[in-house]
Design a protein with these regions (language model features):
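Phosphate/pyrophosphate-binding catalytic cores of soluble transferases and nucleic-acid-acting enzymes
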Residues: 1-255
Length: 255
């Protein structure tokens, strides 16, 4: 397999071993690893996001891990800009860029490009979120299809985040999110990407997730959540979506 001109994309479910697999490949083909997980971006959440530790990063360069503060929303556009720069730098060093992640939108933006959708005022966005909450997801999704039929079959009808995003874009710009996405252009050719997907059967994956969760608690996940909660972040910040924060907070509050 000729990998010299490739950009390797590794994806898969939580606890499927993407990070360790990426290191294994990087050692064999002289690669460097770029983070493509939107939560491993945040520096204060090392344990809960399963960010590669110093031992795992030894001898292999890792990029874009723990670079953003949880007090900010780190956008897909910011990630894409930094990633394109890193890919070019890695290639100049005659090495292979290996991207590892669980964030589909990141990979999608790299492969297809990212269009600049006009900024939507937070007041307007909050209004749409409240509408979704009051209507319920099922009714809200049906309303989306009425104003934006192009959203049909594009994502899971139960995906609140994507439904709200599609609704606010169509409502504010009068243009479907999928028409905006049609205007994109990538910095790379499709043939440059080598896509690898790791998967396990359901039973094995559940076991791996359980083992990972136990390990996280042992190495300080509860303490990490305590520190995070002391920051008293605004609810709309992305870092609040890290899996484990809500669950461990309820545990700490004895709920």
């Amino acid at each position: 397999m000729d990998t010299q001109s490739k950009i390797i994309l590794i994806s898969g479910p939580t606890a499927s071993g993407k990070s360790s697999f990426a290191v294994l490949i990087a050692k064999k083909i002289n690669g460097e690893i770029i983070n493509s997980d939107s939560m491993q971006i945040y520096k204060q959440l090392k344990i809960l996001t399963a960010r590669p530790n110093k031992k795992e990063q030894k001898n292999i360069k890792h990029h874009l891990y723990g670079i953003a503060d949880v007090k900010i929303n780190f956008s897909t556009g910011q990630w894409l800009k930094l990633t394109i720069k890193k890919i070019k730098e890695i290639r100049r060093r005659k090495k292979i860029p290996i991207l590892v992640g669980g964030t589909g939108l990141y990979f999608q933006s790299l492969i297809n490009g990212l269009v600049t959708i006009p900024n939507i005022p937070m007041k307007f966005r909050n209004k749409i979120r409240l509408m979704q909450k009051n209507n319920g997801q099922e009714a809200f999704y049906k309303n989306l299809l009425k104003i934006d039929p192009k959203s049909k079959n594009k994502f899971d009808p139960n995906d609140v985040q994507r439904t709200v995003r599609a609704f606010e874009i169509k409502s504010y710009t009068k243009i479907s999110m999928y028409d905006w996405l049609g205007k994109t252009k990538s910095n790379f050719k499709d043939k440059e990407f080598l896509k690898l997907y790791i998967n396990f059967d359901r039973e094995s994956l559940i076991k791996r997730i359980s083992q990972r969760t136990s390990k996280m608690v042992k190495i300080g996940a509860i303490q990490e959540v305590k520190k995070f909660n002391k920051l008293r972040l605004k609810k709309e910040l992305s870092a609040n979506k890290v899996i484990g924060i809500e669950e461990l907070t309820k545990y700490l509050n004895s709920e």
